[in-house]
């Protein structure tokens, strides 16, 4: 009799609409229960039985129940699942398979089966890519996944690399394809094979894409020619190789090996500016005045060169610092190194006075054995030879930015707008509390930004600098010329790494159009989106592999008294993140390790400080001694403890 009763239906509808609901993200805990986080201030308890319907990270709508002053959430509707495509480790065998996602907060095995047409018999410990097919909030009985790709077996020494590349859906090897002959581009190439060009790189580098030649001019000025490898002389726009490079966007540099953007035959041989081999290049000739200013007579042209020496960073630095036993092979090469060091000094001073110079941070290099084991991690400080190349490249990129802006009005530009205007007042207020007075309007201009950066660099510690970092906007890739506040420059367009950056290949083609006096087509904005996304994925992949290798490297230090100097890089409610100075590893120090009495401890992300009994005990940028308490291999996390 109650079937199709309109009154009953109306009552149900009314009850439904009156029941309080909330949308938020599920946060799991290790104890079975969870929370529905609605915003930074509000969260609701999810009891263990209800947690079985959801997964950590799911965005859901839940019904809110109130019983005896306590509110709890009952998941009702899935807005966006946390897991769609993921990597994990297979459990079980044959017909009864499950997969545990490789994520620190997802511990439960998800029943699964191999997709049709996947010819691999999965067994315990295998790594796989899976896609979620069922979810309890979609009306399914349980979670269920489908294995779509076999990655590798559990004991493979190279798991960190293969799993990370599969996780981010990145290529594992160099692209296929060969370039048989140079294109006829209608360019007249200047023959510079007689000049003493040199390359300066790491000893192991094969893809040399820049060579330098310097000359002293009679009036105290210096001339610099930057010659850059010319892959667009081999790769036609729109060709198969070009399309592959466009998708990859960058060479992916991971600890231990790289996955090139171009076929290795091109990147490491045909285009690489090897010593004593004649190579086509795109070149830029510039004149530097005595104070390091780049004069207006910038000239881009096509040429052929023959590098006369493959020099190595450390050897060149040693020689310039009068240490070590390496000597340039001839007086001509020695003269080049001396002139390039002069150029470096002039340009460094010019940038210090008129733009911005980054603080030198060491690069960390993993030294790996045959089986991917970490033999050592060495900090490689940026020395004079690194700076020679850096100054030459920055100068060349400034030249390209100017020429493309003035002749075409577009190109592939690296743009950084400094501070987000919405944050200007908060920034000024924060600086004021530390005794620095800035105008909220002025700090949004290039000059105002540079002025502030110089004041911050003059501070005794980097603490204040670290506090304002959150107010900065991100660097972007744009087809429109614009300033790069981070470098303190009006415009910056890179063209010096075309073997490893697709944007630089585009700028090569545009510069060639300028050289030939032809009209050029503005690059489409989609390409900048693809490049930004690939750059993000490559950085995440590099970080993920690094985390894995750091965990392997420090595993045997866990629980020992070995001390490490560590810089505090971030403070949150739960504790502090630190970077080990000698090797670059990131470790976490939980709040209870800082002070046993929780009520006497205040960890403030806002202030970048840890206070104990009202006194500041730690702050971001402090360097402290730590020991390694624990290394959790399954999550690749390192837990440290301050030395008392």
Swiss-Prot record:
One of its GO terms (molecular function) is exoribonuclease II activity. One of its GO terms (cellular component) is cytosol. It is an enzyme of class 3 (hydrolase). Belongs to the RNR ribonuclease family. RNase II subfamily. This is Exoribonuclease 2. PROSITE patterns: RIBONUCLEASE_II (PS01175). Residues 561-643 form the S1 motif domain. Its EC number is 3.1.13.1. Gene3D superfamilies: 2.40.50.640, Nucleic acid-binding proteins. InterPro entries: CSD (IPR011129), NA-bd_OB-fold (IPR012340), RNase_B_OB_dom (IPR013223), RNase_II (IPR011804), RNase_II/R (IPR001900), RNase_II/R_CS (IPR022966), RNase_II/RNase_R (IPR004476), RNR_Ribonuclease (IPR050180). It is found in: Cytoplasm. Its main location: cytoplasm. It catalyses: Exonucleolytic cleavage in the 3'- to 5'-direction to yield nucleoside 5'-phosphates. GO terms for biological process: mRNA catabolic process. Residues 189-516 form the RNB domain. Involved in mRNA degradation. Hydrolyzes single-stranded polyribonucleotides processively in the 3' to 5' direction. It holds the Pfam family RNB. Keywords: Cytoplasm, Exonuclease, Hydrolase, Nuclease, RNA-binding. The gene is rnb. NCBIfam families: 3_prime_RNase, PRK05054.1, RNase_B.
């Amino acid at each position: 009799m109650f079937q199709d009763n309109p009154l009953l239906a109306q009552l149900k509808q009314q009850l439904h609409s009156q029941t309080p609901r909330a949308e938020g993200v599920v946060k799991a805990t290790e104890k079975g229960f969870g929370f529905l986080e609605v915003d930074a201030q509000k969260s609701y308890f999810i009891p263990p039985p209800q947690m079985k319907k959801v997964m950590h990270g799911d965005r859901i709508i839940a019904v809110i129940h109130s019983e005896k002053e306590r509110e709890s959430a009952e998941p009702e509707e899935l807005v966006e699942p946390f897991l769609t495509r993921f990597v994990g480790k297979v459990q079980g065998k044959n017909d009864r398979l499950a997969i545990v996602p490789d994520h620190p907060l997802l511990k439960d095995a998800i029943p699964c089966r191999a997709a049709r047409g996947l010819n691999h018999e999965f067994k315990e410990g295998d790594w796989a890519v899976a896609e979620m097919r069922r979810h309890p909030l979609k009306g399914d009985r349980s979670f269920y996944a489908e294995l779509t790709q076999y990655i590798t077996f559990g004991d493979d020494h190279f798991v960190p690399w293969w799993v990370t590349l599969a996780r981010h859906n990145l290529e594992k090897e160099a692209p296929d394809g060969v370039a048989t002959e140079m294109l006829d581009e209608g360019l007249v190439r200047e023959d510079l094979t007689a000049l003493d060009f040199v390359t300066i790189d790491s000893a192991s580098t094969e893809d040399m894409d820049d060579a330098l030649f310097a000359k002293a001019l009679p009036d105290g000025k210096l001339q610099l020619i930057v010659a850059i490898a010319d892959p667009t002389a081999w790769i036609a726009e729109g060709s198969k190789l070009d399309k592959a490079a466009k998708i990859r966007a960058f060479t992916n540099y991971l600890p231990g090996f790289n996955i090139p953007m171009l076929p290795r035959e091109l990147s490491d041989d045909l285009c690489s500016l090897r010593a004593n081999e004649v190579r086509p290049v795109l070149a830029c000739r510039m004149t530097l005045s005595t104070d390091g200013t780049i004069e207006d007579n910038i000239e881009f042209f096509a040429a052929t060169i023959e590098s006369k020496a493959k020099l190595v960073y450390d050897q060149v630095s040693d020689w310039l610092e009068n240490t070590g036993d390496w000597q340039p092979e001839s007086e001509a090469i020695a003269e080049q190194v001396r002139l390039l060091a002069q150029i470096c000094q002039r340009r460094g001073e010019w940038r210090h006075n008129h733009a911005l110079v980054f603080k030198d941070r060491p690069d960390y290099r993993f030294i790996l054995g045959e089986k991917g084991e970490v033999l050592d991690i060495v900090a490689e400080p940026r020395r004079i030879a690194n700076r020679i190349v850096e100054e030459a490249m920055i100068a060349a990129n400034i030249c390209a930015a100017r020429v493309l802006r003035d002749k075409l009005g577009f190109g592939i530009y690296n743009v950084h707008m400094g501070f987000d205007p919405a944050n200007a007042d908060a920034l000024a207020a924060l600086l004021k509390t530390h005794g620095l007075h800035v105008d909220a309007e002025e700090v949004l201009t290039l000059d105002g930004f540079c002025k502030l950066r110089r004041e911050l660099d003059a501070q005794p510690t980097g603490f204040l600098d670290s506090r304002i970092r959150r107010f900065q906007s991100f660097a972007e890739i744009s087809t429109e010329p614009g300033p790069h506040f981070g470098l303190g420059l009006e415009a910056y367009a890179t063209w010096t790494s075309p073997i490893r950056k697709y944007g630089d290949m585009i700028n090569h083609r545009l510069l060639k159009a300028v050289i030939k006096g032809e009209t050029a087509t503005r690059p489409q904005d989609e390409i900048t989106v693809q490049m930004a996304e690939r750059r993000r994925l490559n950085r995440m992949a590099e970080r993920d592999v690094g985390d894995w290798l750091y965990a392997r490297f420090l595993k045997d230090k866990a629980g020992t008294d070995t001390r490490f100097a560590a810089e505090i890089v971030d403070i949150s409610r739960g504790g502090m993140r630190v970077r080990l100075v000698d090797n670059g590893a990131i470790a976490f120090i939980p709040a209870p390790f800082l002070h046993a009495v929780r009520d006497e401890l205040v960890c403030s992300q806002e202030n970048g400080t840890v206070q104990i009994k009202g006194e500041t005990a730690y702050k971001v940028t402090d360097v402290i001694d730590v020991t390694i308490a624990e290394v959790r291999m399954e999550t690749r996390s390192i837990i440290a403890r301050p030395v008392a």
